[in-house]
């Protein structure tokens, strides 16, 4: 996997991608990250990459020419086809399903805008899709690019010490449920004890408990993700039993 990122702040992406799981994946050669600053491709003494918008209004707009030259340099550096993705609040929301789709690509170019945005002509001519982190506005696309790099890199084969870790994450699995609660040492603590079933050694019971917790947690916190009518009989039973337990805890 190769990431090429068009950004005015390539050092930001280099730093964030060098940490933790993603940093280790990069050290293993599971992906490569290349930052490209459009200012390096701007003309004139001031290396200007923005100008005022036609029609007036506040802010500045990123210019076509530096971006076009930057993108051409990326294509010249490696002939491998790349999907060009613009990080934008106008894009489709990023989901785990989209992350899995992107993880199967050999290469992508992440375009990070700044100021009021990018000249629409450049976007129409070069961008394959737009992706958003959510319904809010950031100062630029760099955080969105960092999120995509992190989410995609950890799905590369060998990125995680245990491949099952990714399979058990929130939004994965057959229903895309939220993850279940997790506990570690000590087993007993003033804040509460670890559920007995997790210490029982009964793997079938543990799996059923985790499934139940995922169902209940998804129904409570993200009901938009759960189509209860599509649940099988076993899952419906687990969900109802889990709800009863939650009700008993709330009304002892």
Swiss-Prot record:
What is a GO molecular function of this protein?
tRNA (guanine(37)-N1)-methyltransferase activity
An example GO biological process term is: tRNA N1-guanine methylation
**Keyword list, A-Z:** Cytoplasm, Methyltransferase, S-adenosyl-L-methionine, Transferase, tRNA processing
Q: Which reaction does it catalyse?
A: guanosine(37) in tRNA + S-adenosyl-L-methionine = N(1)-methylguanosine(37) in tRNA + S-adenosyl-L-homocysteine + H(+)
Q: Where does S-adenosyl-L-methionine bind?
A: 113, 133-138
The record ties this protein, via Pfam families, to: tRNA_m1G_MT
Q: Where in the cell is it found?
A: Cytoplasm
- What's any one GO cellular component for it? cytosol
**Top-tier EC class:** transferase
Q: Per the record's keyword annotation, is Mitochondrion included, yes or no?
A: no
Q: Which EC number(s) does the record attach to this protein?
A: 2.1.1.228
- Broad class of where this protein is predominantly found: cytoplasm
| NCBIfam families in UniProt | PRK00026.1, trmD
- Tell me the function of this protein: Specifically methylates guanosine-37 in various tRNAs.
Which family does the record claim for this protein? Belongs to the RNA methyltransferase TrmD family.
Assembly and partners are described as: Homodimer.
Q: What is this protein called?
A: tRNA (guanine-N(1)-)-methyltransferase
* Source organism (scientific name): Stenotrophomonas maltophilia (strain K279a)
Protein's gene: trmD
């Amino acid at each position: 996997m190769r990431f090429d990122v068009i950004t005015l702040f390539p050092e930001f992406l280099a730093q964030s991608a060098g940490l933790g799981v993603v940093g280790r994946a990069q050290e293993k050669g599971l992906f490569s990250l290349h930052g490209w600053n459009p200012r390096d491709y701007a003309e004139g003494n001031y290396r200007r990459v923005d100008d005022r918008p036609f029609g007036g209004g506040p802010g500045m707009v990123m210019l076509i020419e530096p971006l076009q030259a930057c993108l051409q340099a990326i294509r010249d550096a490696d002939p491998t086809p790349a999907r060009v993705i613009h990080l934008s609040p106008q894009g489709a929301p990023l989901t785990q399903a989209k992350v899995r789709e992107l993880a199967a690509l050999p290469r992508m170019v992440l375009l990070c805008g700044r100021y009021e945005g990018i000249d629409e002509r450049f976007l129409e001519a070069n961008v394959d899709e737009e992706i958003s982190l959510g319904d809010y506005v950031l100062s630029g696309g760099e955080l969105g690019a960092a999120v995509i790099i992190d989410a995609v890199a950890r799905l590369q084969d060998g990125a995680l010490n245990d491949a099952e870790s990714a399979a058990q994450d929130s939004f994965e699995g057959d229903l895309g449920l939220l993850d279940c609660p997790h506990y570690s040492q000590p087993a007993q603590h003033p804040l509460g004890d670890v559920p007995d079933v997790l210490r029982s050694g009964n793997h079938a019971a543990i799996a059923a408990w985790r499934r139940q917790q995922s169902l209940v947690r998804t129904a409570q916190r993200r009901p938009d993700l759960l189509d209860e009518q599509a649940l099988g009989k076993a899952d419906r039973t687990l969900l109802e039993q889990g709800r009863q337990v939650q009700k008993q805890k709330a009304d002892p």
